[in-house]
Structures are given as C-alpha cells and as structure tokens.
Design a protein with these regions (language model features):
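Divalent-metal coordination cores built from histidine and acidic residues
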Residues: 1-83
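Histidine/acidic residue-rich metal-binding segments in metalloenzymes
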Residues: 24-30, 59-179
Length: 179
C-alpha cells in the first residue's frame, strides 16, 4: 500500500496493529466502531506474497496456487467482501518492481475464482492493462461465468473499448460485469 496508494510506510507501521496473520485475525484487529461501513477485500498481492515469500514475483507452482485458493476461500468464509487483483503497469512495490501477481497466469486466477464459486459469496475487482488480450478476457469471462459473482473491471485509458465490449456481451448473458 505504501507505494501503490502513496501511503507513507511510517503511517502504516504506526497506525495499523500488525499482530495478525490470517484474514480473520485482521478483521478481528480492526473490529472497532466506525462512523461508516467498512468492507475488506482479499488482495491477490498480499496472498501471493504470504504464500510464495521472495518467490512472489515468479511463476506460481501448483502447490502455491492451491494454497492461494485455500487462503482466499477461508478469507471469504471469514467475512471478506471479495477478491482483488492488479495487473496494471502503474502499481509498483516499494522497490520499484511491478506488484506480485501482475503477470500471474490465468490458471492461477481461475483457481482463486473456484474458491469464490465454492463459497458463493464476494465480488471480484480487477485492474488490468491487458484487457485487449484475448487470454486476459478469457479468464475474466471464465471467472464471471464460473462464480456468478459481480466483477468490477477498473478501466485504464488504453483499454476502455475492450472492457465495455466485453461487459456488454457478458451483461447480456445475465452476468454482472461493471467497468
């Protein structure tokens, strides 16, 4: 968050109680009265880093993918609002590298999509600079159809027409795609 959302690292370290490991622990740590409704989503970046450690920028193994899907499923069962993934070439980590998961294989995302389908809960939020790529469109369409869950695609300037076209097609099929 400190590099993607421009939140100073010191503010994160001082303002967030870091004594948690699981998503349920995290939700418990922030369970205090708020003046607004707050929903927490499972970020692909964090799950990938947790499962793969320093290898989080590499291709995931079958075991890595299974672990990411299991963690996502458990987080959804524990109260996560949904799952998010960034495939946007403007999201960098604090070292200047693209965030983990930017180049994740569609099969990895489909496995995580299966977790959403099994729970039948949650939303999917995607930001991608590759929506003109048929492979990218394929896994997004697959997740929308497999899960039946709402999918939000954040539109970057170079892919708007591709996203709108896909959304119109899938919405006509009764799916919930929102650019």
């Amino acid at each position: 968050m400190e590099s993607v959302e421009d939140i100073p690292g010191t503010a994160l370290h001082e303002g967030i109680p870091w004594g948690w490991e699981s998503f349920a622990d995290y939700l418990h740590s922030i369970d205090t009265p708020y003046v607004m409704d707050v929903g927490a989503q499972v970020p692909h970046v964090a799950v990938r880093h947790y499962v793969m450690g320093a290898r989080c920028y590499d291709d995931a193994t079958a075991d890595d993918i299974a672990a990411m899907a299991a963690i996502t499923k458990q987080a959804l069962q524990d109260g996560a609002l949904g799952f998010t993934t960034s495939r946007f070439y403007g999201h960098f980590d604090k070292h200047g590298a693209l965030v983990p998961g930017t180049h994740a294989d569609g099969e990895e995302l489909k496995a995580i999509g299966n977790a959403l389908a099994e729970v039948d809960h949650g939303t999917v939020e995607i930001i991608s600079d590759r929506m003109e790529d048929p492979d990218e469109q394929h896994w997004v369409e697959w997740i929308a159809k497999r899960t039946g869950r709402p999918v939000t695609i954040l539109v970057t300037s170079n892919i708007g027409a591709d996203v709108w076209g896909m959304a119109e097609k899938l919405n006509a099929q009764g799916l919930k795609i929102r650019p």
